[in-house]
């Protein structure tokens, strides 16, 4: 099997690329970072530090790389068996035209072998969104062929991959936690289902997408926002602060109550899942900066993301949400000179006030009780 992976960043190399290469898949990375591309093509290998109670260094080998803006990408899409991405939600739209061109070339060459495309992004149904962008770039006459020959497979991914401390010396070295989870929707594949160690197949993906979003992502974000407010530098420092831990655990329990109601997750198993997440945040070997985790607060406060979506679930089922509200208020306080969204958030609050700003960002009713609660919490910590 041959695969093209868009995104040779830390998550691409440390998570999806590593799983594919470890499974014996012939792997080519596509990226725009020339330093990384040159290093991959010079060495055809890189090292991954897997850190936990026992640290190990794994070597990923047999890889190469192409520039994602080059015609090489188009040619590869016409021949490979799998395309994956780890580029960030915003970049999916940018890579879609190249994917569309590659699919048209594949059709022109008469290659009718099934091709499956999997976006491995921190978003709900990311591949379905990528498919929309790809279809927008296709001519009408090509859409039916793509629909019948190309699988667009949604997935849920989970692995904490902070920036590597040694990246300044070696652009390829990456540090990851031991835990990883890659769950894919088996109902969306074309052709035979692949067998790749570390890839789990399910016919109930949304349950796992929301479990991860409402627990790992919700908890991670709230830890970062409360940690930043309290002057902590890392996620570990923040989660070891008992006041913060209480709110984070409470928020994950509130979002968990939504998951249990919606999908029938087992109470005890979900409680254990929350404990596992908290222990991952405590990992002393991951230097995960609160500012990195908190960046892009406008996206994280949007209706379909990690703070507002679980809150909407609590409103839907009439469940408690006071800790989620505290997390939302902390997100509204997030400031970073290096993050344009943090600056835009600050400007929006300055121009419109916290009530109208939160309503605009989140889609919540400005006059609702929950917005009033969030604004009160925001003002209480101003």
From Swiss-Prot:
E.C. number(s) listed in UniProt: 1.1.1.17
GO biological processes: mannitol catabolic process
Binding site for NAD(+): 3-14
Domain of life (superkingdom): Bacteria
Gene Ontology CC annotation, any one: cytosol
Keywords: NAD, Oxidoreductase
Pfam family, one: Mannitol_dh_C
A molecular-function term among this protein's GO annotations: mannitol-1-phosphate 5-dehydrogenase activity
Catalyzed reactions: D-mannitol 1-phosphate + NAD(+) = beta-D-fructose 6-phosphate + NADH + H(+)
Family indicated by similarity: Belongs to the mannitol dehydrogenase family.
Name listed for the protein in its UniProt record: Mannitol-1-phosphate 5-dehydrogenase
Organism expressing this protein natively: Cronobacter sakazakii (strain ATCC BAA-894)
Gene: mtlD
């Amino acid at each position: 099997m041959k695969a093209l992976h868009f995104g040779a960043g830390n998550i691409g190399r440390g998570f999806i690329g590593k799983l594919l290469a470890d499974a014996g898949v012939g792997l080519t990375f596509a990226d725009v970072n020339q330093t990384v591309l040159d290093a991959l093509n010079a060495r055809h290998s890189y090292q991954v530090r897997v850190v936990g109670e026992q640290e190990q260094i794994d070597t990923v080998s047999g890889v190469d790389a192409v520039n994602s803006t080059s015609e090489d990408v188009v040619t590869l899409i016409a021949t490979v068996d799998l395309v994956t991405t780890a580029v960030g939600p915003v970049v999916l739209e940018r890579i879609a035209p190249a994917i569309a061109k590659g699919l048209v070339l594949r059709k022109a060459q008469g290659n009718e072998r099934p091709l499956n495309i999997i976006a491995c992004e921190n978003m709900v149904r990311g591949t379905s969104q990528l498919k929309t962008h790809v279809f927008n770039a296709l001519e009408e006459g090509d859409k039916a062929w793509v629909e019948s020959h190309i699988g667009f497979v949604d997935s849920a991914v989970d692995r904490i991959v902070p920036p590597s401390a040694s990246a300044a010396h070696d652009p390829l070295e990456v540090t990851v936690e031991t835990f990883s989870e890659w769950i894919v929707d088996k109902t969306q594949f074309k052709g035979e289902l692949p067998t790749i160690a570390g890839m789990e197949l399910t016919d109930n993906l949304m349950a796992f997408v929301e479990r991860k979003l409402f627990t790992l992502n919700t908890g991670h974000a709230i830890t970062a926002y409360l940690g930043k407010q309290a002057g902590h530098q890392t996620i570990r420092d923040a989660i070891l602060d008992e006041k913060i831990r209480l709110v984070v655990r409470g928020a994950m329990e509130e979002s968990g109550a939504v998951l249990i109601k919606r999908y029938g997750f087992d109470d005890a198993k979900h409680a254990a899942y929350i404990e596992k997440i908290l222990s991952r945040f405590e990992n002393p070997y991951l230097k995960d900066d609160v500012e990195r985790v908190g960046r892009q607060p406008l996206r994280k406060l949007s209706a379909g993301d990690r703070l507002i979506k679980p809150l909407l679930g609590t409103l839907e089922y009439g469940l408690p949400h006071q800790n989620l509200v505290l997390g939302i208020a902390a997100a509204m306080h997030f400031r970073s000179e290096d993050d344009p969204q943090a600056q835009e958030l600050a400007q929006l609050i300055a121009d419109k006030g916290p009530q109208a700003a939160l309503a605009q960002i989140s889609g919540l009713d400005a006059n609702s009780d929950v917005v009033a609660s969030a604004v009160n919490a925001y003002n209480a910590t101003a």
